[in-house]
Amino acid sequence: EEMLAAEQNCYSLGELIHNDDVVRHLQSEGLTVVDGPEQIPPGASVIIRSHGVSRAEFEAVQRTGATVYDATCPKVKRIHEIVAEASAEGRQPVIIGAADHPEVRAICGWCEAPIVVNDAAELAARIADGTIDCAKPLTVVIQTTQTQEKLLECQKIIKKQCTNAKLFDTICGACLLYTSDAADE
């Protein structure tokens, strides 16, 4: 809100948070939500939401000459670094999460040829059908809002079948607490 009060021309790539009431309030304060960098006018101020954006989108925003306020969650930024490094090393990035989630789409945009699996069953199926080749080096990350249970189920499969896999626990503890508290209510 402070930024909206100080800036005239403020945009966000996608909704900042998953809360329609808050998004509507921010829009009433002057925030314009856009779907892509091509909708950002030169000289605007742009907020990158906590889910992050792909490398291509980030660079496209920078090319507009916009002032960029990067609110990407530090945990998500770390995943971007992990998968980018994996690609640079020739490792196959595997992302455990919801393929259509903005965070996962953004992660995919920081690496080459990522494979996204939703859960242990899909992971096992992708290994069985050869989409994931366990003989090759893999780097496995998980969407920050996923559960430890899902990670452990996938970890069992990976440890049993893949000999050269680096598995990163990239789940956000704060998200787990929030999810747990919401489930308790």
Residue ranges and their predicted role:
Residues 32-41:
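Short acidic low-complexity segments
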Residues 178-185:
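Conserved small/polar residues in nucleotide/adenosyl-binding loops
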Residues 144-158, 162:
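Glycine-rich phosphate/diphosphate-binding loop of Rossmann-like nucleotide-binding domains
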Residues 68-69, 82-88, 93-130:
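Internal gly/pro-rich beta-alpha loop/helix module
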Residues 10-16, 95-97:
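Short internal beta-strands
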Residues 19, 53-58, 100-105:
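Short, glycine/polar-rich helix-capping loops at beta-to-alpha or helix-loop-helix junctions
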Residues 14-30:
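N-terminal beta-loop-helix "entrance" segment that forms/cooperates
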